[in-house]
């Protein structure tokens, strides 16, 4: 049962990342390979503030606007100039940015492992016999609330409806008078908030190191592919399922194979969809 609880916690972290990733993927039309590094950058900014004696959750709030500015700046400096570029160009550009951010993190924070100063971590013993820490309870509650608010935002607000319109057909949205760059801006902010949250929660639940960006991206991308690009429901289900699979696999496999589970999920999902496409 402990593996099940751990899987739900990890799944919630993946859900935060995959939800932000799939929103931007659907809106901009390409998988941003730098998203894992943005998650990690937000976590390291939070770590820097936390190291000054600021409580970790307050540090997270302070790191959010900095991470948002970084995400928007990257888009304005690079991707805005490539809006009409082909898919391979956009992917290569995002790969270059991911390498730059990874190098930046290594230069500023070094190559070692870092831990957040969370303080005492009280534990709760559940009726099923598993143990969950208070920070893990917060991670689950935060993730549920964030995803619920995002669902309401996309379904009930004008900005959310405009976001769906731009994601469906950017040309028609322009003809209808929707300011697509404004929509991109606000969704970058949302994506950055989800990214920094997921990165920080992973650091709280385990640790941080400069190579974690790719390890973050793999499960996030796998959950997005599994749940269908652009589908928040799919990102939610895919993230939870992948988190549970990764943790339950630790019963039989070494924890070193966890990133391989995400990669395997991507390959299997693409294979199944290709077979179904050919049959259809």
Locations of the language-model features?
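Transmembrane helix-bundle core of multi-pass membrane transporters
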Residues: 81-156, 183, 248, 253, ...
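Alpha-helical transmembrane segments within multi-pass membrane transporters and channels
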Residues: 21, 54-97, 104, 237-242
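Helix-loop-helix "hairpin" substructures at the membrane interface of multi-pass membrane proteins
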Residues: 127, 131-208, 234-237
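Membrane-interfacial amphipathic/re-entrant helices at transmembrane-helix boundaries
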Residues: 1-16, 45, 56-59, 85-94, ...
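Cytosolic-side transmembrane-helix boundaries in multi-pass membrane proteins
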Residues: 108, 168-175, 179-182, 252-280
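Pore- or pathway-lining transmembrane helices of multi-pass membrane proteins that form conduits
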Residues: 37-41, 82-106, 213-225, 241, ...
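Membrane-embedded helix boundary and interhelical linker motif in transport proteins
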Residues: 5, 27-73, 77
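Inter-helical junctions in multi-pass inner-membrane proteins, predominant
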Residues: 1-13, 132, 153-158, 185-224, ...
